[in-house]
Every structure is written in C-alpha cells, then in structure tokens.
From Swiss-Prot:
Keyword presence, Electron transport: no
Pfam families per record: Homeodomain
Protein's gene: Hoxb8
A GO biological-process term: sensory perception of pain
Protein name: Homeobox protein Hox-B8
Organism: Rattus norvegicus (Rat)
GO cellular component: nucleus
Amino acid sequence: VLSPIPSSRRTQRGRQTYSRYQTLELEKEFLFNPYLTRKRRIEVSHALGLTERQVKIWFQNRRMKWKKENNKDKFPSSKCEQEELEKEKLER
C-alpha cells in the first residue's frame, strides 16, 4: 500500500478505550441525536475530556453499528438464513 507519508513519519495509534461514564454519556447523546453539529461535538468533547476527533469517530462507528443491527432483519447474513427465508416464502 502506497502512502503519501513516509513510513518513518507515520504513527500507529492505539485503540481508544472509553470509561463507563463516557460510553454512557455518548450513548445517551446518540439516542437523542445520531448526528452532532460541530458546536455540540465541541461541548460533548469538553464535558467528557475527549478530543473532537474521538467524539466524531465514536459517532461514525456507532451509526455503522446501528445500521448493521437494523439491517439484520432485512438482509440475511448467511446462505443458511437465505435458504430459510426462501423456504418460508414457499410455505406461505
């Protein structure tokens, strides 16, 4: 993979772990609104002691998780599930 930044300058970031309190507050905020304005993102990041970037990425990841969970019913995740759905349709 080619990168515009030389490998000697790239830094590998570790995985961010959030405290229970931070996760709870982020989840509450997400339930209220899955999309944050920049102003609200700044407020949340200051209140939780996180960077704006961390909050932004947490929300992006959470929206993808929500999307996957809600599409589970609509799209079978395996061939076996697909066959079961087709079988049910034929029985109707």
